[in-house]
Structure formats: C-alpha cells, structure tokens
C-alpha cells in the first residue's frame, strides 16, 4: 500500500491539511452563504406567497364588487323601467282625461248651439204667427169692407186654416 502511496506522491499530512481546509471552507460557506441565501429565498417565498394571497383576496373582493355593481345596475334598470311604465301610464291617463274633457266641451257647445237654434226657431215661428195674424186681420178688414158671400167666407176660413197649419 505504501508503494501505491509513493507512486501517487501521497502525503498524509497534506491530505489532512487539505481535508481540514475543505471542511473550514465548507463551514464558512455554510455560515456566510448558505444560511443567508436560504433566509433570502425563504423570505422571497413568503413574500411571493403573501402577494399571491393578497392577489387572491383582491380578486375575490373585485368579484364581489363586480357582482354588487351588476346587482345595482340591474336594480337601476328595473327602477328605470318602472319609472318609464309609470310615466307611460300617466301619459295615457292624461291623454284620456284631455280627450274626455274635449268631448264634454264639444257636447256642451253642441247642446248650447241646439238651444240657441231652438230659441231662434221659436222666435221666428212667433214672428211668423204674429205676421200671419196681422195678415189675417188685414185680410179680414178688407173682406169686411166688401160684403161677403157665404162662398167667400168659407174660402177665407179655409185659407186662414191652411196658413196657420203651414206656419206650424
């Protein structure tokens, strides 16, 4: 075995010092590099995890707000439709009321016109009767001026009756 060690130029003291150097370097690397690097990675992982949780919470909150806004929008649409329906109903009622008032006013005007026509007709008939009576008196006066025969009297009576019937 010694022959192998001599062929390889193996020195146990060098090997021991190199092993100790390796262990010291590994210890120093562990203390100064691996632990801080592990801590940085753990902190980064925790920060990323927190950010993901915050993002999930923010997304859930945004979805809740969106759902609430959609519900409010639906409510606003329903309210707008209800207002539109009420306005349409009120417009129809107002239209019907205006039409009824116009119809009633037209009926009152027509009735007033009919009453005025009847009054004028009555006045005209009274005037005609008065005129007919005057004419009858005038005719009677003229007839009396001359002597009447029974045929003339009968003819005058028939004419007066016909005139009165015609005037009525």
Swiss-Prot record:
Described function: F(1)F(0) ATP synthase produces ATP from ADP in the presence of a proton or sodium gradient. F-type ATPases consist of two structural domains, F(1) containing the extramembraneous catalytic core and F(0) containing the membrane proton channel, linked together by a central stalk and a peripheral stalk. During catalysis, ATP synthesis in the catalytic domain of F(1) is coupled via a rotary mechanism of the central stalk subunits to proton translocation. Component of the F(0) channel, it forms part of the peripheral stalk, linking F(1) to F(0).
GO molecular function: proton-transporting ATP synthase activity, rotational mechanism; proton-transporting ATPase activity, rotational mechanism
SUPFAM superfamilies associated with the record: F1F0 ATP synthase subunit B, membrane domain
Matching Pfam families: ATP-synt_B
Keyword Transcription: no
Identification of the protein by name: ATP synthase subunit b
Parts of the chain that traverse the membrane: 13-33
Organism: Moorella thermoacetica (strain ATCC 39073 / JCM 9320)
Keywords assigned by UniProt, alphabetized: ATP synthesis, Cell membrane, CF(0), Hydrogen ion transport, Ion transport, Membrane, Transmembrane, Transmembrane helix, Transport
Membrane topology qualifier: Single-pass membrane protein
């Amino acid at each position: 075995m010694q022959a192998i060690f001599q062929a390889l130029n193996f020195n146990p003291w060098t090997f021991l010092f190199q092993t100790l150097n390796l262990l010291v370097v590994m210890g120093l690397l562990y203390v100064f590099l691996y632990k801080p690097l592990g801590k940085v990675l753990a902190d980064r992982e925790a920060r990323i995890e927190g950010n993901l949780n915050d993002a999930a919470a923010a997304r859930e909150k945004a979805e809740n707000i969106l759902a609430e806004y959609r519900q409010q929008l639906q409510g606003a649409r329903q309210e707008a439709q209800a207002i539109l329906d009420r306005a349409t109903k009120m417009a129809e009622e107002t239209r019907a009321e205006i039409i009824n008032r116009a119809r009633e006013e037209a009926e009152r005007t027509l009735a007033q016109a009919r009453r005025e026509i009847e009054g004028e007709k009555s006045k005209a008939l009274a005037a005609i009767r008065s005129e007919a009576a005057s004419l009858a008196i005038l005719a009677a006066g003229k007839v009396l001026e001359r002597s009447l025969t029974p045929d003339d009297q009968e003819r005058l009576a028939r004419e007066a009756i016909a005139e009165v019937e015609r005037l009525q």
